[in-house]
């Protein structure tokens, strides 16, 4: 497995693979890999001849008081895990490689980004869309793989790729969870044992709402309130948002008559966690 630190290196690797007629699968990450990331890589491996991942903690998607500086980083560990699932190359650029002096171009997707994480993290999706556009242009994959845990991000990237006529397919992979239901996240490492226990309220509240939906409840406000009440009962939880929108349009709903996204963001201590569930059949 090759580790490339420069754009020219990873482009040369991809060019060589293409010259042999190999398809390219791409998984962009910020590193500190977990089983959710590895599942994306396995899906890429199943579908594509060559798998490239990026490991880049992107500064433009973090706000001024967020966790950019303390976001966990361990390239040696990540390379070992990626190698075990058959990744062919890692692109691990520096900030200077991606954003050289004088950089001033950004990508902004409208409408889909003005709610949920986009509302509580201003500028976040501008940073995400910019770095993903750059990575797509550098790697030029046939397929790119994103996790459903970041449901809004996956929808935004799909919209961006379609709107800008990017020549690739964006594939969303179901959320991978711990045995007790907690959605896999690199930020879970921040949680102490008591916070880790408290964090289960996210997945359990989604499951409770899912049960009510399957039992026939279609009133979006009642389902939302059910989740809010359950999370508020957890002393360590501080709610950022709990919302229900049509899926994939992300339009407000009163009654759920088709697929709907129940999405939430909750702070456990200082750690912001997100999770979601799709209500209704896709």
Curated annotation (Swiss-Prot):
Residues given in the record as (R)-pantoate binding sites: 61, 153
Gene3D superfamilies: HUPs, Pantoate-beta-alanine ligase, C-terminal domain
One example GO MF annotation: pantoate-beta-alanine ligase activity
First-listed, main subcellular location of the protein, grouped into a coarse class: cytoplasm
Highest taxon in the source lineage: Bacteria
Keyword vocabulary terms for this entry: ATP-binding, Cytoplasm, Ligase, Nucleotide-binding, Pantothenate biosynthesis
Pfam family, one: Pantoate_ligase
Keyword check for Ribonucleoprotein: no
GO biological process: pantothenate biosynthetic process
Annotated binding of beta-alanine, by residue: 61
SUPFAM superfamilies: Nucleotidylyl transferase
Cell compartment(s), UniProt: Cytoplasm
Reaction(s) the record says it catalyses: (R)-pantoate + beta-alanine + ATP = (R)-pantothenate + AMP + diphosphate + H(+)
Residues given in the record as ATP binding sites: 30-37, 147-150, 176, 184-187
Subunit structure: Homodimer.
UniProt function note: Catalyzes the condensation of pantoate with beta-alanine in an ATP-dependent reaction via a pantoyl-adenylate intermediate.
This protein's name: Pantothenate synthetase
